[in-house]
């Protein structure tokens, strides 16, 4: 179908422990520097298991490209800007050894909740996270009060969820939203 009904939109912010991080990064460059200066204290979830991890990776890539690339479908961003792509993946590789580790190896938590669990247990001090997850978990008491949110000057990609009803559905009235 051609119809999309949004039911939830949320943003990814930087969630951090205010007891251990007095001055959270304000820019992506400051974040990358913080990660290197605080080995093992930052994580993002496996991007294939949660969008907050995907958001960190995608933003790291887009931050190396011209601003227009983030909203353009022009093939030139794939073919004419290979140096910027290479720089982005090099940056991710450079950050890799400074991320959260367990058993002596970098470990990417599973799902958005996995990153927040590490933050709640004080195994990391900072992670990208969906605002609605942080706020609801703080309200339920599963995230401590010292967990705060901040947004970088280069905002993280968010997440929009919605419903689509295919036009081949059995109940024709429902696909006419």
Language model features by range: what are they?
Residues 126-145:
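A ligand-binding cleft/hinge motif common to bilobed small-molecule-binding domains
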Residues 27, 170-177:
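Short amphipathic alpha-helical coupling segments at ligand-binding clamshell hinges
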Residues 5-9, 35-37, 120-121, 141-143, ...:
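Extracellular/periplasmic catalytic domains that process cell-envelope and extracellular macromolecules
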Residues 1-114:
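Extracytoplasmic ligand-binding site segments that recognize negatively charged/polar headgroups
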Residues 111-127:
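Short helices/loops that flank or line small-molecule/ion binding pockets
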């Amino acid at each position: 179908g051609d119809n999309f009904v949004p039911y939830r939109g949320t943003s990814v912010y930087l969630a951090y422990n205010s007891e251990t991080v007095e001055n959270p990064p304000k820019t992506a460059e400051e974040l990358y520097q913080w990660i290197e200066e605080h080995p093992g204290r930052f994580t993002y979830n496996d991007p294939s298991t949660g969008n907050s991890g995907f958001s960190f990776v995608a933003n790291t890539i887009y931050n190396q490209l011209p601003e227009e690339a983030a909203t353009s479908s022009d093939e030139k961003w794939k073919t004419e800007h290979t140096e910027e792509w290479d720089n982005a993946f090099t940056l991710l590789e450079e950050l890799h050894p400074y991320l959260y580790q367990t058993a002596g190896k970098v470990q990417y938590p599973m799902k958005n909740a996995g990153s927040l669990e590490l933050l709640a247990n004080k195994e990391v001090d900072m992670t990208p996270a969906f605002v609605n997850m942080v706020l609801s978990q703080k309200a339920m008491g599963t995230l401590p009060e010292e967990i705060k949110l901040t947004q970088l000057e280069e905002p993280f990609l968010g997440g929009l969820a919605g419903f689509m009803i295919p036009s081949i559905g059995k109940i024709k009235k429902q696909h006419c939203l």
